[in-house]
Amino acid sequence: MATMRVNACSVAYEVIGDGRPWAITPGGRFSKDSPGVRELATALAERGNRVLIWDRPNCGASEVCFTGTSESAMQADALAALLQELDMTPAVIVGGSGGSRVSLLTAARHRDVAAGLAMWWISGGVFGLMTLGVHYCGGSLKAAWNGGMEAVAELPEWAEVIERNPANRQRFLEQDPATFIATMERWMAVYCACGDELVPGLQDADARQLRVPALVFRSGASDFNHTRATSEQLAALLPDARLVEPPWGDGEWNHRSAARPGGRGEGLFIGWPALAPVLQAWADEMVGSPA
């Protein structure tokens, strides 16, 4: 595992294979080591690609960072900078769940870094978005309000980033509680469902202007976190998008997420390697040969 400082934050990453540049971003605050992520990267590398997997700021072994208009925008800017530093632009930028949002924002905010864009499990709908704001920001905001930054550093949701990068604990403690609370409120507000942002942080008008080959996998009808309507509407918004069915059944997300709390599941992303043939065929057709 290597690290690189981008935008004043140290980011952990790995590059697998050689060929056309790709970047894979998982969802939640899960790391690049979550089962299924590396396996997808390896499957793409075996098809002649150079694939970046990385820990976003606030994930895995990377540093915590509390700048930016939103957490996803901050992570998108970090991905763009990392790809540029690694001489991997333009890249095919792909991701699922929260990783799809980061991928989309990366392409929208940094047009020159994206050769193509593929997304699945795109968060949306009033319920899906409102719960995300609480999930990502609510616990930290409440802890900082009631117990200061010591209480934030003790939250289970931050245990992995402190365990894998112990210096992160001090980074939490160095935050001014009032400023941190304001950041959490700002980040939370981005998830408020509104009529002109299908995907939080990206105006629909800007999505309509994003001229990059895009592949959107249709969400399951049973998935209320990443609604089918959101995937269909995003495919309609993006001018060069193709909507396709995923290589798994309707209940993939629900099945994987239901298994996690009891420790019975293999991980949310374990099915991702099945995407490789579809992604490769689409990239060969729509993205073209790497420079």
List PLM regions with ranges:
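Conserved serine/cysteine hydrolase catalytic core
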Residues: 186-237, 242-246
